[in-house]
Amino acid sequence: MDSQLANPPNAFNYIESHRDEYQLSHDLTEIILQFPSTASQLSARFSRSCMKIDHCVIEYRQQVPINATGSVVVEIHDKRMTDNESLQASWTFPIRCNIDLHYFSSSFFSLKDPIPWKLYYRVSDTNVHQRTHFAKFKGKLKLSTAKHSVDIPFRAPTVKILSKQFSNKDIDFSHVDYGKWERKLIRSASLSKYGLQGPIELKPGESWASKSTIGVSHLDADSDLDSAIHPYKNLNRLGSSVLDPGDSASIIGAQRAQSNITLSIAQLNEIVRSTVNECINNNCIHVQPKSLK
């Protein structure tokens, strides 16, 4: 169901800019649009209204030779966005094609900020010299104000081709897609019952199992989904004595390093003597002495 304003917005009549000549450029060059007067903007601002573009028409009238080639690209940018995300809509058409471009806005903007809409053009793959006054542009804007913003049904940009030798197969235009949205849960105490609390802080008499997500709730103990997410949920019911893993590896290593094993000198000599004798007896072959006759 389309959202509607409780009170119809105050609509301005179409505000037309002059039909001015523009020089051919391979870089983005601004097309000057005529916006409501400063007095009108101040009046809307004092009434605490916001504004949107209901309809924007860009008229293109070429003035190049019949053998001119190339494409004209017209872009609408919203300067509230970062430079690489400001493009809202674009049109591409032959340089010799007289055409009207139509754009419908999908958002409001605040009159406390500079008007964010900018219109640019550039020419590519052309055999016409740069800085040649190749065409005339004229912009027409219809704006409206409202006490507050509402959801605006999307309307795609369109074109009206005025040159008979061209058709919609020679034209291309596009509109930016909706921004991607990803839900990000806020970790707070109010969500602790869902196992989404922040860093665990143990207090005297508490165990890690009773404070962590494996034992925070008993209301969903019979839920298969909850059991799959937290398979050790009820581990805290076993008691701290069962959950105690014992001394850590560092403690055991320190204890081993501190163990006292003492031997007297006589005991150490006896161990060495017996070890040497054992080696001699096991590895030396006894040779019978030869008698002299």
Curated annotation (Swiss-Prot):
Q: Describe how it is modified after translation.
A: Phosphorylated.
Instruction: Please give a single GO biological process term from the UniProt record.
Output: transport of virus in host, cell to cell
Keywords, in A-Z order: DNA-binding, Host cell membrane, Host endoplasmic reticulum, Host membrane, Host microsome, Membrane, Phosphoprotein, Transport, Viral movement protein
Its record classes its membrane topology as: Peripheral membrane protein
Short name of any one Pfam family annotated for the protein: Gemini_BL1
Q: List the disulfide bonds.
A: none
GO CC terms for this protein? host cell endoplasmic reticulum membrane; host cell plasma membrane; membrane
Hey, which family's this protein in? Belongs to the begomovirus movement protein BC1 family.
What the protein does comes down to: Transports viral genome to neighboring plant cells directly through plasmosdesmata, without any budding. The movement protein allows efficient cell to cell propagation, by bypassing the host cell wall barrier. Begomovirus genome is shuttled out of nucleus by Nuclear shuttle protein (NSP) and the movement protein transports the DNA-NSP complex to cell plasmodesmata and facilitates further movement across the cell wall.
Question: What is the name of the protein in this document?
Answer: Movement protein BC1
Source organism (scientific name)? Bean golden yellow mosaic virus (isolate Puerto Rico-Japan)
